[in-house]
Amino acid sequence: MRGTVRTRGTVRTRGTVRTRDMLRAAIAGAGAAAPVLAIAILGVAVITPAGHDAGRLAFRLASAIRILPRQSAAAARGRPFSGTPAVGALFTTSGGHLADHFCTASVVHSRGGDLLLTAAHCLTGKPIGRGGIVFVPAYHDGQSPYGAWRITAVFVDSAWSSRHDPDDDVAFLRAGRPGSQIEQATGAERLGVGLPPQQVRVIGYPDAAARPITCRAPARGFGPRQLVFDCDGYADGTSGGPFLAHVSKATGRGTVIGVIGGYQQGGDTPDVSYSIRFLANVAALYETASRG
């Protein structure tokens, strides 16, 4: 998770644990009564059937291992920059002043010109209403070039609110300021639903940094309803950061096809990030938020 309660850095065995679970499932499917042969794969002791059952098990093991995220020995790394207008940081407030930024959000085009997009887990336990959370677009180095916008409403899917389903880790927020619309001030990203995995630019605000980071790399499929993105530096605070496809060189805006969140609430290590895939559930939630 990349919100304030995430323990990034303390869990470093995620890949090993996931592999072990997959190996156990593959072994169970091979038949418990078969003769066995002890082998070792990825440092995990495995008991596998001897004879021709070993061939079927080897296929299951290879399939399990292949679906794990790939990481390059020379992985890309996010670089700090001064920000872009339609992406910003979510802050808590204290005494009417900005306190700490804890997650990332982006402005998305809507009929009312007032919707933001982030990860649902970012809002868990946060004080919505009465100015408890504000959005600061293009925040950097203590500067708020487009001001601070109060969050007045939050929209999440019922599957998230009832059981925190990782495939529904997305939220739309309404941002308000008397007499103005945020989209008129900052411009907006487009919402992309049902699009395939592709090259993206991901922007996020690490909570210990004064500037956002940006990185371009492929977003790959991770199961039927998730995406995975390999780039280092996406630590606490980057949850909700948009996966931007087709970014315009002229405006810096693009099409949001995901946000950091989903599996492991965005990832247990800074070099691998996840997002849900934007499918019919996100389209329906967007329509609800647009009407609400």
Where on the chain are the PLM-derived regions?
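Catalytic histidine site
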Residues: S82-Y139, A219-G223
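Solvent-exposed loop/turn segments at secondary-structure junctions
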Residues: G96-H97, G112-G113, C122-G125, D141-Q143, ...
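C-terminal cap/linker of serine protease catalytic domains
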Residues: I257, Y263-G292
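Chymotrypsin/trypsin-fold serine protease catalytic domain
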Residues: I151, P166-G237
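Loop/turn elements at helix/coil->beta-strand transitions in domains of secreted/extracellular proteins
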Residues: G112-D114, P196-Q199, G252-T255
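Conserved catalytic-core segment of clan PA serine endopeptidases
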Residues: A73-P85, T92-S94, I133-G179
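Catalytic nucleophile loop of clan PA
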Residues: G233-V259
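Protease-domain processing segments flanking chymotrypsin-fold serine proteases, especially trypsin-like
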Residues: R2-T4, T19-S110, A284-G292
